């Protein structure tokens, strides 16, 4: 009789546990940022110490790039981003958000920017903006239209030509 009670209690606990896990899995709303959504605004300091926000780029297309100095693909695409910034400065804003909490120091980020002669803003992310944008891999690039709406999300390296195509600049 005791064995039947224990088996019944175990069965009820197992069914309850399974039900709870299913509820937790399927009741969650989809998280992350998607194409067609307004890009969340943020404000971060630049390497030069000034405050910069995504709102500063309103009215221009935006190439919002999340990167790190230790990321080889990030290093490969930086020259293309710099060329784009110079060629299309009147209608494009390149915004590079550095994953600063994973860097050895801001000096390392500054040395990187100097090595590549980068003139676009390098934002120092100590607030976890990369997590807000659901960045799981570097580089990750968000393409925004002039109103700040996400048009494309690209994970991995892009060539200048690919950037121009995604930004509809060519």
Swiss-Prot record:
Q: Which organism is it from?
A: Bacillus subtilis (strain 168)
The protein's name: Thioredoxin-like protein YneN
State the source organism's domain of life. Answer: Bacteria
Q: Please list every transmembrane segment annotated in the UniProt record, as residue ranges.
A: 5-23
Give the similarity note.
Belongs to the thioredoxin family.
Gene inactivation effect:
No sporulation-related phenotype.
Q: In the UniProt record, what gene is named as encoding this protein?
A: yneN
Membrane topology value = Single-pass membrane protein
Q: Name one Pfam family in it.
A: AhpC-TSA
Q: List the disulfide bonds.
A: 71-74
């Amino acid at each position: 009789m005791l064995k039947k009670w224990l088996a019944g209690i175990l069965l009820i606990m197992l069914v309850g546990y399974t039900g709870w896990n299913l509820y937790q899995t399927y009741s969650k709303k989809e998280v992350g940022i998607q194409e067609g959504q307004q890009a969340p605004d943020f404000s971060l300091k630049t390497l030069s110490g000034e405050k910069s926000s995504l709102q500063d780029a309103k009215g221009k297309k935006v190439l919002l790039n999340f990167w790190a100095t230790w990321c080889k693909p990030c290093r490969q695409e930086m020259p293309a981003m710099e060329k784009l910034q110079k060629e299309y400065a009147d209608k494009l804003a390149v915004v590079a958000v550095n994953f600063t909490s994973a860097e050895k120091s801001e000096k390392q980020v500054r040395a990187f920017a100097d090595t590549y002669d980068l003139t676009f803003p390098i934002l120092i992310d100590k607030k976890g903006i990369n997590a807000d944008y659901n960045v799981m891999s570097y580089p990750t690039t968000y393409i925004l239209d002039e109103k700040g709406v996400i048009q494309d999300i690209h994970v991995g390296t892009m060539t200048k030509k690919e950037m121009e195509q995604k930004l509809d600049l060519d």
